Amino acid sequence: MAKLAEEMNPEGSRYQLLLSCPSGLSPSQVSVDFSKSHDRIPRQDPGLEDSISQVWEQRSQGNSSLFNGQKFRYGGYCLDDDDGSTNEVPHVCLRLGLTDYRTFVGTNLSSLWEKFLVTSEDDSVRCRHTSSPLGNGAVIETSDKKIIVLRRSNNVGEFPGHYVFPGGHPEPTAVGIDYHQLENNVQTGEVLNKKVTQEMFDSIICEVVEETGIPASSLSSPLFIGISRRELNVRPAMFFYLKCSHHSDDIQRLYSSAEDGFESTQLHTVSLDELKMMTSRMPGCHHGGFALYELMLQRLKNTKETSLIAT
């Protein structure tokens, strides 16, 4: 089955790792620069820009579940490592703007998506004309070391029927953002940036609870492990690692009461080897999430080996 899916859509599972944080970063090691300067820049092509509303109208006709809403736009990142050390735990600043689902459908998900790209080695420049809303995903380990994977329903907008990690999007409205405020007040801007940073971590907990039924009290604090981008549609997503105190046998019972269970048809708790076999049936951004998890595991292994040698 996995091989067949890959043959049907080989592009769909390809990915690029934009940022890897294998040590796992806590909220104190992540910050956000939320600014209009990180918003999408319109393409200097009136016909292409007009296609955004046309694609949206076509997609929304007869689809009552499709609605527009604000999203955070991924505009790149910077690493704050001013001391020049080789510390593996840097401080990451995410550059975020504002976009909406309508523009996402009309740029990234459009059949014309490649025409919105610019030839550049700089990812933020290459994708400056795309909506690029920042998605999120959670690699969750149960108490018996199984990983939770969902199979998407056929009613979702992207990759129906594929395997994914629980996740969704951090939401601007969760921190009271409907539009860009005047940024004359530096103090107000700093407060807002802190709220947006916290939303990056709070939102993944909310998504996990809503999609799996696992209570928040059973989850560890999320650790940010990086950002991947699906090559098809240049779709970015940030990934987190969480531990769950429940045994895998308990997860199915919890899933039956999940608030957003309609977004998926099945929940699987799988071993690492089983998960590897499923990656060709994952969207590229989630395949990249698995790669980020592998890098985290490799670092843990290397750290343990180094510790043993030292003793």
Curated annotation (Swiss-Prot):
Keywords: Hydrolase, Magnesium, Manganese, Metal-binding. Residues 131-298 form the Nudix hydrolase domain. Expressed in roots, stems and leaves. Mg(2+) binds at residues 207, 211. GO terms for cellular component: cytosol. This is Nudix hydrolase 9. Belongs to the Nudix hydrolase family. The lineage of its organism: Eukaryota, Viridiplantae, Streptophyta, Embryophyta, Tracheophyta. Coiled coil: none annotated. PROSITE patterns: NUDIX. InterPro entries: NUDIX_hydrolase-like_dom_sf, NUDIX_hydrolase_dom, NUDT22/NUDT9-like. A motif (Nudix box) lies at residues 192-213. Probably mediates the hydrolysis of some nucleoside diphosphate derivatives. Its cofactor is Mg(2+); Mn(2+).
